C-alpha cells in the first residue's frame, strides 16, 4: 500500500508541476532525488561513503547539463510541486530498499501496481475527468504501454534489483532514464545532441561509476540488503 501511494503521489505531483514549469526544469528538479536519497537513507542506518558524495555531485551536474535550455525563469508553483514530487520519489526508493529485505519483491510489485492504479482511477473520478468510449479508445494504447512497460515491468525490475543494491547507488542508476531517453531520441527520432547534452551524459556516467568504487565511510555503517 505504501509503495503504491508513494509512486502515485510522486508521479502525480510531477505531472501537475509540468503544467506550470518547463520540461527542462522539471527533469532537473525531479532528478534531485539523487541527492535526497543518501540524506534520507542515513535515517535508516545506511552508510554514506565518500564515493557516494562524489558520484552524486557529478551526476547532478550532468543532469543540469542535460536539462539546461539556456536560461531558467524564477521559481514558480510548478517548481514547488515538482520538488515535492522528487521527495516522494526519494521516499519510494528508500522504502523499497527497506521492504524488499523482508518481503518478496514480486508480491511488493503486484501490490504497488494495483494500489497505484486504484489511486489514479479514483483521482480521475474526483477531478471530474469525462470517461467516454471515444476517450477510452484514444487513450487505450498509451495507458496500456505505461501500465505494462513502465509501471509493471520497469518498477518490478527496480524492486527486484534493489534487493542487492544500496539505495544511494539505486537512485543513481534510476537517473539513467534521462540518458536513455536522450539516446533513444538520437537513434530513433534522429534528434541532434548538443555539446551540453553530450557533456551531461558523460558526467552522469562518470558519477554512477564513481559511486560504485570502494572508499572510506563518511557517516554510518554500510548496510547492504541481503541477496536471495
Regions found by a protein language model. Name each.
Residues 1-13, 77-85, 133-153, 174:
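Loop-to-transmembrane-helix transition segments
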Residues 1-30, 65, 147-165:
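Specific transmembrane alpha-helical segments of multi-pass solute transporters/efflux pumps
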Residues 17, 22, 43-48, 99, ...:
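Hydrophobic/aromatic residues within transmembrane alpha-helices
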Residues 26-32, 96-118, 151-187:
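Helix-helix packing/entry segments at the starts of transmembrane helices
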Residues 33-54, 179-198:
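C-terminal transmembrane-helix exit sites in multi-pass transporters
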Residues 36-38, 56, 74-128, 143, ...:
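Transmembrane alpha-helical segments that form core, pore/gating elements
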Residues 48-68, 86, 120, 196-215:
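Hydrophobic transmembrane alpha-helices of multi-pass small-molecule transport proteins
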Residues 139-141, 175-228:
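C-terminal-most transmembrane helix of multi-pass membrane proteins
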Amino acid at each position: 500500500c505504501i509503495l503504491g501511494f508513494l509512486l502515485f503521489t510522486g508521479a502525480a505531483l510531477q505531472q501537475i508541476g509540468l503544467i506550470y514549469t518547463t520540461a527542462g526544469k522539471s527533469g532537473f528538479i525531479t532528478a534531485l532525488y539523487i541527492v535526497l536519497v543518501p540524506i534520507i537513507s542515513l535515517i535508516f542506518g545506511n552508510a554514506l561513503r565518500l564515493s557516494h558524495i562524489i558520484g552524486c555531485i557529478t551526476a547532478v551536474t550532468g543532469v543540469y547539463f542535460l536539462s539546461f535550455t539556456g536560461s531558467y525563469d524564477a521559481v514558480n508553483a510548478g517548481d514547488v510541486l515538482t520538488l515535492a514530487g522528487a521527495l516522494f520519489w526519494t521516499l519510494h526508493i528508500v522504502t523499497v530498499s527497506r521492504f524488499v529485505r523482508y518481503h518478496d519483491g514480486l508480491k511488493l510489485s503486484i501490490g504497488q501496481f494495483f494500489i497505484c492504479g486504484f489511486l489514479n482511477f479514483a483521482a480521475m473520478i474526483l477531478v471530474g475527468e469525462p470517461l467516454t468510449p471515444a476517450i477510452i479508445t484514444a487513450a487505450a494504447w498509451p495507458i496500456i504501454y505505461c501500465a505494462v512497460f513502465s509501471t509493471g515491468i520497469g518498477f518490478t525490475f527496480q524492486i527486484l534489483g534493489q534487493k542487492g543494491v544500496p539505495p544511494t547507488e539505486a537512485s543513481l542508476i534510476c537517473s539513467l532514464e534521462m540518458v536513455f531517453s536522450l539516446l533513444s531520441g538520437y537513434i530513433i527520432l534522429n534528434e541532434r545532441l548538443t555539446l551540453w547534452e553530450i557533456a551531461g551524459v558523460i558526467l552522469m556516467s562518470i558519477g554512477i561509476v564513481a559511486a560504485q568504487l570502494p572508499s572510506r565511510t563518511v557517516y554510518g555503517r554500510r548496510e547492504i540488503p541481503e541477496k536471495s
